[in-house]
Each structure stands twice: as structure tokens, then as C-alpha cells.
């Protein structure tokens, strides 16, 4: 596959992740009165990755996440030359996904971006009121384990064909743990799209949801290299 094909796949895949994951939170979490709730939103995020892994995994590897690209790079599984193009495509896809979601959601009477639009936050903008430090630790640790699952399940020595399931279930588990803490990022592209529409506090806090996932991902890549060095 050439780079334009890979970038197109990453763009569409990340658009689907934001539309499916954030869309479930914005459109369905509290509908009609009970809605799908935390469990449903968590499953939605996992399902977006699982479905796209089968759809575009053979084209781009289905990163859909700058942290995943950084983690694979740190683990020696992704070339430096492709890092920036992938991240550009992922961020563009995240913004486009948020744009499609906004076009849909804004058609409902009473819709307001003030409700958060599935943005990530800390302090008063954390769903559970968690501090910046708590959110930082959570995002680093969650992304670290996410990347360990990705690196391990896609290793040539791992059982074939099960990686999308393991990765999708891992992302679901991560959301079950961390939605109350940070609204769950582990993905700078997922955070960027909604934040740009909300503006204000969501943009001012966006730095954490770039820094923490990338730190966690790189740590996972280093750990993965250590495991392989022991072979």
C-alpha cells in the first residue's frame, strides 16, 4: 500500500472511532431516559476499533491513534518516516468525525456544546471531579497497558486472527475504568476533535490528552523491547 492509501484508511478509521465512540456518548448514553450508559459507551469504543481492525488492518495497520503510532514506533514496529503522515491523517479524521457528530447532534432541539460533547477533562471538567495529577496518571497507565496488548497481540508469535478482539476488548475495559476519571482519552486524535468544537476549557486542557497517552505509549514500547531482548 502507498502512503496516500494508508493515510486515507487512517482518516476514515479515526472518523469512525470518534463518530461511533463519542457519538454513542453524545447521542445514546442517556436516551431515552436511561440510555446505553457507561457500559454501552465503553462497548461502542471497543467495537469501533474491532470493526475497523478487520476493515483496514491490512491496509494501514489500523492505528487510529497517534499514541498507538508512537508506541509501535518506540517498540521498533513502525518506521519514523511514516509517523507524521499517520498522525496528520488521524487528527484530521478525529476532527471530521466530531464534525459529522456535531451536524447530527445539533439537529436536536436543546442540544448544546456546553454539555461537553464527549470532551476529556480534569478538575471540574472530569466526570468524577478528579485532579489533573489523577487524570495524568490514569491516562499514562491506561495507554501503557493498551499498547502492551496491541504490541503483544500483533506479535508474530501470538495466535493469529485474535488481535482485533483482544484490542477491542482492552479498549472497552479501559473505558469502563476511566470514563469516570477523564472521560477516557488514551487517544490524542479522539480528544482533539470534540475539544475543537467545544473550545474554551476543552482546548486549554487538551495538552494533557496529548502528553499522557504518548508518554504511556512510549513506555509500553520500551517495555516491549525489553521483553524481546530477553528472548
UniProtKB/Swiss-Prot annotation:
The entry's keywords: Cell inner membrane, Cell membrane, Membrane, Repeat, Transmembrane, Transmembrane helix, Transport
One of the GO BP terms on file: water transport
SUPFAM superfamilies tied to this protein: Aquaporin-like (SSF81338)
Motif NPA 2: positions: 187-189
Organism: Shewanella oneidensis (strain ATCC 700550 / JCM 31522 / CIP 106686 / LMG 19005 / NCIMB 14063 / MR-1)
Gene name per UniProt: aqpZ
NPA 1 (motif): residue ranges: 65-67
Protein name (Swiss-Prot/TrEMBL): Aquaporin Z
Membrane protein topology class: Multi-pass membrane protein
